[in-house]
A protein has these predicted regions:
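Short acidic (Asp/Glu) and glycine-rich catalytic loops that position anionic groups and cofactors
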Residues: 91-92, 113-120, 163-172
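Structural signal for hydrophobic packing residues in well-ordered secondary-structure cores
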Residues: 1-9, 49, 94, 136-147
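Ligand/cofactor pocket segment of small-molecule handling proteins
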Residues: 82, 97-144
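Structural signature of the thiamine diphosphate
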Residues: 130-167
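Conserved small/polar residues in nucleotide/adenosyl-binding loops
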Residues: 176-183
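Acidic, glycine-rich active-site loops and adjacent beta-strand->loop/helix elements
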Residues: 25, 62-68, 90-96, 127-131, ...
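A glycine-rich helix N-cap at a beta->alpha junction
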Residues: 84-88
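Cofactor-binding active-site loop characterized by glycine-rich and histidine/acidic residues
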Residues: 1-82, 100-106, 111, 116-118
Length: 186
């Protein structure tokens, strides 16, 4: 909370806010102001883990909107080519900022875009804690056993607009009521 309120005792000394948190001590390398730019950074961290013979997995979180950015595909390629311990996690809430996924991306299964690079993965209900937990365990076990990346697409629900300044008027009332929103695990 100190970081979010701009205090010096925050993990980024109060300068990161909600988008640019960073803590090397906690191995949290934060968000990024450019959509999808954290993905190659996460692959670089995975490379460092492999290079140093560390038994660690780099976790890279990205939204469905980032899945149409070129650097994401470049990162998938290198993660697979170099067999890096990286877990890619897509939060698919059906909107990249204010654009519906149907207007910006061909195909329904975003995780399948990584399969062309030989990355195994799956799509799960991101609103179900147990489903997410089971998928994370499968991913961890696969990465540790095979020394290869894995991808999980989590279908979830966006309860509000993209940010405080986004009233979400591009969504119909039906989208707010169907499917029935549940507590999200993300």
């Amino acid at each position: 909370m100190s970081e979010l309120t701009g205090r010096k005792d925050g993990i980024s000394k109060g300068k990161g806010g909600s988008m640019h948190m960073f803590s090397k001590a906690n191995r949290f390398y934060g968000g990024h102001g450019i959509v999808g730019a954290q993905v190659p950074l996460g692959v670089g961290i995975g490379f460092a883990h492999k290079y140093r013979n560390e038994k660690k997995i780099s976790r890279v979180y990205l939204g469905d909107g980032a899945m149409s950015n070129g650097q994401v595909f470049e990162a998938f390629n290198l993660a697979s080519l170099w067999e890096l311990p990286v877990l890619f996690i897509i939060e698919n809430n059906k909107y990249g900022m204010g654009t519906s996924i149907g207007r910006s991306a061909a195909g329904n299964e975003l995780f399948e875009r990584a399969t062309v690079f030989g990355i195994k993965g799956e799509k799960v209900d991101g609103m179900n804690f147990f489903t997410v937990s089971d998928a994370a365990i499968r991913a961890r076990d696969y990465i540790n056993k095979n020394s290869k990346p894995y991808i999980i697409e989590m279908d979830t629900y966006r309860f509000r607009g993209h940010s405080m300044s986004d009233p979400g008027l591009y969504r119909t009332c039906l989208l707010y009521t169907s499917p029935s929103p549940r507590d999200s695990t993300l």
